[in-house]
């Protein structure tokens, strides 16, 4: 993938896929970061030496600061095991945010963060080692987006 992103022609023969003289056109104008969205030991071992960022879904860490901190510790350990300095990796968390009553179309085993509590939650996530947060709004609509944007504008 890195060779394709660097503008190289690539030939690959795999068990399930192959590519012959593949090239990515137009070529990227900058380095494209690669993010891993996995917490599994096998995939971490395979991918951590090659990625720029790691992301986890809210259900993987219980949508809590403590859960993220614990998982971040596991990821840092996996980085070391893979021969990677954890500080070189961007650490990212998806956060489930409920606006108002929400839509009800979300997992019942994970408590959402209320929009009004989001600024403090994001500060605490940063203290726990999150470099970025990807917000998953419930409901996902214009009103919710505006309300959340207004709630966190002072963090920018």
Where do the model's predicted regions map?
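Active-site-adjacent structural elements that line small-molecule/cofactor binding pockets in enzymes
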Residues: 1-156
């Amino acid at each position: 993938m890195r060779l394709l992103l660097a503008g190289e022609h690539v030939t690959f023969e795999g068990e399930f896929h192959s590519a012959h003289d593949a090239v990515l056109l137009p070529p990227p104008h900058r380095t494209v970061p690669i993010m891993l969205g996995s917490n599994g030991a096998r995939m971490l071992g395979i991918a951590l030496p090659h990625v720029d960022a790691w992301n986890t879904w809210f259900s993987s860490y219980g949508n809590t600061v403590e859960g993220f901190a614990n998982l971040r510790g596991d990821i840092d350990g996996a980085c070391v095991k893979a021969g990677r300095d954890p500080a070189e990796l961007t650490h990212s968390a998806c956060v489930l945010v409920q606006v108002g009553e929400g839509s009800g179309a979300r997992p019942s085993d994970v408590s959402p963060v209320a929009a009004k509590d989001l600024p403090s939650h994001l500060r605490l996530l940063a203290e726990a080692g999150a470099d970025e947060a990807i917000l998953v709004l419930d409901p996902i609509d214009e009103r919710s987006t505006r309300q959340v944007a207004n709630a966190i504008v002072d963090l920018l």
